[in-house]
From Swiss-Prot:
GO terms for biological process: menaquinone biosynthetic process. It holds the Pfam family TPP_enzyme_C. Its EC number is 2.2.1.9. Catalyzes the thiamine diphosphate-dependent decarboxylation of 2-oxoglutarate and the subsequent addition of the resulting succinic semialdehyde-thiamine pyrophosphate anion to isochorismate to yield 2-succinyl-5-enolpyruvyl-6-hydroxy-3-cyclohexene-1-carboxylate (SEPHCHC). The gene is menD. This is 2-succinyl-5-enolpyruvyl-6-hydroxy-3-cyclohexene-1-carboxylate synthase. It is an enzyme of class 2 (transferase). NCBIfam families: menD. InterPro entries: DHS-like_NAD/FAD-binding_dom, MenaQ_synth_MenD, MenD_middle, THDP-binding, Thiamin_PyroP_enz_TPP-bd_dom, TPP_enzyme_TPP-bd.
Length: 577
């Protein structure tokens, strides 16, 4: 006869699988033994054992981000669970579905000085969409139904709009080793199946769609702003809507609008450089902005929207309240793709295209041409990495971009292309931690994958490289090594020379070759762009882990960025004369 621990753990795990979980990331530990062994015995789950908890959590986040469905994450009790915290925060803000299962001591061992027992109740606070402290294992039918139901609820809550992490705290008494065989699965499935959930996406009633379309079509100077958003079908729908409304689209690199076979007539990729030119920025102020997704990375765009509060900003979001400019006039709580399709049902072709739209597209063409013309052809420049990768990556590849300078350079130098590419990043809390692990997690589902990352961020997550070795993953990592925090050289702190290097520049003078080799990777340092192209091409064709270290100068990087922005401003000013 099956014991309570075995059937209860099996019911919980089978409930996760029946609700749609197919991958689980596990951190080793004793108290989580019932969950880990039940998962290992389940035929519908693929497991990834990641030793470092912080890395494991970001790995699960990257996997869930790329798969766009919940991933289970399991650890033992104590500080192991606390180490999941940074990834849980990122998952919450970037709306990634995670089911975090933390094993715990039984109730009688809590708050009495027992070893490896911390207060895990609501450990992640408001960053968990839902929390449950499970009952201790019992073998009664109702308790097995309870375990399966809690598992199904956790998965469906994580996947519901807006997606995010949930926390399931699971206490277990010793002995901890379950005995799971076919009889256990039969017992679990004889009791009940996990509840089936039919989940829809929010849509507006037709009268609201009609009213919104009237407001948009009446605008003489309209813009669509698309921030980070990864929704199948959205690119085709929003570009069709842009054409119908004659609204240019300011497309963040994470909007998935810059790359692909969809119509890009209205997709603008150089607005960040345009809005740095004050005359152009003042002349291009719209009447209305229809905004999709999270706030774009561009600071000039953010400040421009914040400064011109007369702009009617309509924020489309399927949940939450993303208005960092505090300037939104209206919120539309709807699925983005559905809303575009609904608006298109009301759309009537415009007989006369506006000069406003044409001016924006002309400015974008001028800015992009100036950037491309003045990019250095021979010397190292970090922005060139993105123009090179746009050519080198095969159709269908994924580009994972690190925070700080890399994502900003992607915004400026990752130009629109007809090649299908998927661009990913951790832009929820925007931290530089966990990026290697996130990218390797994403590489499970998005391959080939190239990560572009700075040296401090790479150092932060060196442990993450172990996942590539343990799971035989392929990834190309372009390491931009300017020996410190390059973004600070663009900030006011750079004017304080005395303490700048100590407090902000933080040079580490690290050699990464041995660390990469320790984790079974290949490390190369190209000396020119021809070698860079060769290394990337070889890495993409051969597979495995390959770190291509591009050594740059922070001072030269700042000089070149400012030169390029000045050239764009000069060309635009000349056009506006």
């Amino acid at each position: 006869m099956a014991d309570a621990l075995s059937v209860y753990a099996a019911a919980l795990v089978d409930g996760l699988a029946q609700a749609g979980v197919t991958e689980a990331v596990i951190s080793p530990g004793s108290r989580s033994t019932p969950l880990a062994m039940a998962m290992a015995a389940h035929p519908g789950l693929r497991l990834y054992m990641n030793i470092d908890e912080r890395s494991a959590a970001f790995f699960a986040l990257g996997l869930a981000k790329a798969k766009q469905r919940p991933v289970a994450l399991v650890c033992t009790s104590g500080t192991a669970a606390a180490n999941y915290g940074p990834a849980v925060v990122e998952a919450y803000y970037s709306r990634v579905p995670l089911v975090v299962l933390t094993a715990d001591r039984p109730h009688e061992l809590r708050d009495v000085g027992a070893p490896q027992a911390i207060d895990q109740l609501h450990l992640y606070g408001r960053y968990a969409k839902w929390f449950v402290d499970l009952a201790l294992p019992e073998e009664a039918d109702d308790m097995l139904r309870y375990a399966r139901t809690m598992a199904a609820r956790a998965v469906q809550t994580a996947a519901g709009a807006p997606c995010g992490p949930v926390h399931v705290n699971a206490p277990f008494r010793e002995p901890l080793v379950p005995h799971i065989d076919e009889a256990v699965w039969e017992r679990v499935r004889s009791v009940s199946r996990a509840p089936q959930v039919w989940r829809g996406r929010p849509a507006l009633p037709q009268e609201s769609v009609s009213a919104l379309y009237e407001q948009l079509s009446a605008a003489e100077r309209g813009l669509i702003v698309c921030g980070p958003l990864d929704r199948p079908g959205f690119a085709e729908a929003v570009t069709e809507l842009a054409r119908a409304l004659d609204f240019p689209i300011l497309a963040d690199p994470l909007s998935q609008l810059r790359a692909g076979t969809h119509d890009k007539t209205y997709v603008l990729d150089s607005y960040d450089a345009i809005l740095r030119e004050e005359t152009a920025a003042s002349k291009l102020v719209p009447d209305v902005v229809l905004r999709f997704g999270a706030m774009p990375v561009s600071k000039p765009l953010f400040l421009w929207l914040k400064r011109h509060r007369a702009i009617r900003q309509i924020v489309v979001d399927d949940g939450g309240w993303r208005d960092p400019t505090l300037s939104a006039d209206s919120f539309v709580q709807s699925d983005e793709w559905i809303l575009c399709r609904q608006l298109l049902e009301w759309a009537k072709p415009k007989e006369n295209k506006s000069a406003w739209s044409a001016i924006w597209r002309e400015m974008n063409a001028i800015a992009r041409a100036a950037l491309e013309r003045h990019l250095p052809k021979e010397e190292w420049f970090e922005g060139n990495v993105f123009t090179e990768l746009a050519d080198l990556l095969p159709a269908g590849a994924a580009l994972f971009v690190g925070n700080s300078m890399p994502i900003r350079d992607a915004d400026t130098f990752l130009f629109a292309t007809d090649k299908p590419l998927r661009v990913l990043a951790n832009r929820g809390a925007n931290g530089i931690d966990g990026v290697v692990s996130s990218a390797l997690g994403a590489s499970v589902a998005a391959n080939p994958l190239v990560l572009v990352i700075g040296d401090l961020s790479f150092y932060h997550d060196l442990n993450g490289l172990l996942a590539a070795k343990m799971h035989s993953l392929s990834a190309t990592i372009v390491l931009l090594n300017n020996n410190g925090g390059g973004i600070f050289s663009f900030l006011p702190q750079a004017r304080h020379k005395g303490a700048f290097e100590t407090l902000f520049g933080t040079p580490t003078d690290l050699s990464f070759a041995h660390a990469v080799e320790m984790y079974g990777g290949r490390h190369t340092v190209p000396h020119n762009w021809a070698e860079f192209r060769r290394h990337v091409s070889e890495s993409l064709s051969s597979g495995g882990l390959h770190v291509i270290e591009v050594r740059t100068s922070r001072a030269e990087n700042v000089r070149m960025h400012r030169l390029l922005w000045n050239e764009v401003a000069r060309e635009i000013a000349k056009c506006l004369e």
